[in-house]
Curated annotation (Swiss-Prot):
Biological source species: Clitoria ternatea (Butterfly pea)
Free-text description of this protein's post-translational modifications in UniProt: This is a cyclic peptide.
Keyword Secreted: yes
Principal location class: secreted
UniProt keyword Disulfide bond present: yes
Cross-link (Cyclopeptide (Gly-Asn)): 1-29
Pfam family, one: Cyclotide
Domain remark in the UniProt entry: The presence of a 'disulfide through disulfide knot' structurally defines this protein as a knottin.
Protein name: Cyclotide cter-N
GO biological process: defense response
Location(s) in or outside the cell: Secreted
Keywords associated with the record: Disulfide bond, Knottin, Oxidation, Plant defense, Secreted
Function (record text): Probably participates in a plant defense mechanism.
Protein family per UniProt: Belongs to the cyclotide family. Moebius subfamily.
Amino acid sequence: GSAFCGETCVLGTCYTPDCSCTALVCLKN
């Protein structure tokens, strides 16, 4: 959805479910 997941990401990897890496942070889909 674009809400911040509370996680930064490196190499495009997010560990929070249903989140994707965007501009070095994880956003909910």
